[in-house]
From Swiss-Prot:
Residues modified to Phosphotyrosine: 28, 332, 341, 422, 533
Residues at the active site: 392
Native organism: Canis lupus familiaris (Dog)
N-myristoyl glycine lipid modification positions: 2
Lipid attachment points (S-palmitoyl cysteine): 3
Catalytic activity reported: L-tyrosyl-[protein] + ATP = O-phospho-L-tyrosyl-[protein] + ADP + H(+)
GO biological process: cell differentiation; cell surface receptor protein tyrosine kinase signaling pathway
Name under which the protein is recorded: Tyrosine-protein kinase Yes
Domain SH3: 87-148
Length: 539
């Protein structure tokens, strides 16, 4: 967790599932039960959760500031499962192997079948293994109803076009590898996504709409209709029949992160955590790689005494844990007595800032950097929909995983910091260079001030981690920005991308784009804005 040091004081961030559209409730209202969203997914788990996704910390060389913030409203997703799944009458099948983490969990193998005894707990269901007869808790995102489409290995549920392309284009995948997902545009329809190759585009992904007939059948072209989706897929593995290539193998996936560490593992005892490898430190604490309960690798943020009030932290953490999106680092558990510990998903690649400056990010070209920006915009568009605010969006607070997957960290806590050097907003610990002028000068933090910060983050990406406003101290940045100064286009950066940055830096917050627009712009960047892009020396 770290801080920004100004010059004045000499001191130096595989499967996919989106969260369904929420139902709004009061930001500080009673905490509702929230189940893992389904059946908008395959039951394969939450999205793009590579098991080795990285976690960095607060500071170290990257100067990470600790956290984000909140606005006045928040939304949650109600349980999509009917109450009728109680009584042990519904059969579910395991999609992955799972090793028990506590004495109340069940270990199981993929393909094992269960009777669901009680699903009212949301993320962890009480179940009975049909094979062993044992009862225990299982993670609900590791199972799907037996004999359903969701139980098929090729079904990836509610996944966007861009995320399907990211998965299929991963290194090592071959032509003909495929997946099936929900259609983004047509309710009740599906999309078949196939990796292809041609001389003009090289490796690419083709998408085909699978439509449903009134009588329940499925088709891509009307001349070939099938009773079930399974029969359509099987036929397409044997005959291209108008597709770019016949289907070869299912796109590989890695089992997802569970929602939380275990049943009722939210406020946990300090003794259940073992701190093993220190990953970084900053003004407000440290971050460690560690183990929970002797079984589960996690990241642990330890806060210095007095950083924030435990009661305020716990209240905010209850809200933060409800924010679930594949581009946000999930909050697993807390130690709520000082010194406060925050337990999150462990991510191995480090912060985006360190990755760009010292890791493999140094060698990335513009397409990869724009895709990373699009992923961050995807996560921020979710925060935007949920009426939340980050407050500290920058490369130091973005975490990088395998295959360049990005997740947003440290959202929801910046407004809780008690340190005078931070709360003054112009103190040495405050990230002035990333903060919109109305927020830095008057404390007006909104999602539009996050948009400003995203524009600054784009300069970090295109300059491989250079500090914004090079050669300028914090006070000078504030004065110059108020007078209308904006950073020039980084060397090698296309002007069309710099134009997006300038939109993010509009003086009037209402004139700045939404994250939904930014995500769309970046995802289609090389087809709409820069179709003639050619790699340069740096970008």
């Amino acid at each position: 967790m770290g801080c920004i040091k100004s010059k004045e004081d000499k001191g130096p961030a595989i499967k996919y599932r989106n969260t369904p559209e929420p139902v709004s409730v009061s930001h500080y209202g009673a905490e509702p039960t929230q189940a893992t969203p389904w059946p908008s997914s395959s039951g394969w788990g939450t999205a793009f959760n590579f098991s080795s996704l990285s976690m960095t910390g607060f500071g170290g060389s990257s100067g990470v500031t600790p956290f984000g913030g909140a606005s006045s409203s928040f939304s949650v997703v109600p349980s999509p499962y009917p109450a009728g799944l109680t009584g042990g009458v519904t059969i579910f099948v395991a999609l992955y192997d799972y090793e028990a983490r506590t004495t109340e969990d069940l270990s199981f193998k993929g393909g094992e079948r269960f009777q669901i005894i009680n699903n009212t707990e949301g993320d962890w269901w009480e179940a009975r293994s049909i094979a062993t007869g044992k009862n225990g808790y299982i993670p609900s995102n590791y199972v799907a109803p037996a004999d359903s489409i969701a139980a098929e290995e090729w079904y990836f549920g509610k996944m966007g076009r861009k995320d399907a392309e990211r998965l299929l284009l991963n290194p090592g995948n071959q032509r003909g590898i495929f997946l099936v997902r929900e259609s983004e545009t047509t309710k009740g329809a599906y999309s078949l996504s196939i990796r292809d190759w041609d001389e003009i585009r090289g490796d690419n992904v083709k998408h085909y709409k699978i439509r449903k007939l009134d009588n329940g059948g499925y088709y891509i072209t009307t001349r070939a209709q099938f009773d079930t989706l399974q029969k359509l897929v099987k036929h397409s593995t044997e005959h291209a029949d108008g597709l770019c290539h016949k289907l070869t193998t299912v796109c590989p996936t890695v089992k997802p992160q569970t929602q939380g560490l275990a049943k009722d593992a939210w406020e946990i005892p300090r003794e259940s955590l073992r701190l093993e490898v220190k990953l970084g430190q900053g003004c407000f604490g440290e971050v460690w790689m560690g183990t929970w309960n002797g079984t589960t690798k996690v990241a642990i943020k330890t806060l210095k005494l007095g950083t924030m009030m435990p009661e305020a932290f716990l209240q905010e953490a209850q809200i933060m844990k409800k924010l679930r999106h594949d581009k946000l680092v999930p909050l697993y558990a807390v130690v709520s007595e000082e010194p406060i510990y925050i337990v999150t998903e462990f991510m191995s690649k480090g912060s985006l800032l360190d990755f760009l400056k010292e890791g493999d990010g140094k060698y990335l070209k513009l397409p990869q950097l724009v895709d990373m920006a699009a992923q961050i915009a995807d996560g921020m568009a979710y925060i935007e929909r949920m009426n939340y605010i980050h407050r500290d969006l920058r490369a130091a607070n973005i975490l990088v995983g395998e295959n360049l997957v990005c997740k947003i960290a440290d959202f929801g806590l910046a407004r809780l910091i008690e340190d005078n050097e931070y709360t003054a907003r112009q103190g040495a610990k405050f990230p002035i260079k990333w903060t919109a002028p109305e927020a830095a000068l008057y404390g007006r933090f909104t999602i539009k001030s996050d948009v400003w910060s995203f524009g600054i983050l784009q300069t970090e990406l295109t300059t491989k981690g250079r500090v914004p406003y090079p050669g300028m101290v914090n006070r000078e940045v504030l004065e110059q920005v108020e007078r209308g100064y904006r950073m020039p286009c980084p060397q090698g950066c296309p002007e069309s991308l710099h134009e997006l940055m300038n939109l993010c830096w509009k003086k009037d917050p209402d004139e700045r784009p939404t994250f939904e627009y930014i995500q769309s712009f970046l995802e289609d960047y090389f087809t709409a804005a820069e179709p003639q892009y050619q790699p340069g020396e740096n970008l």
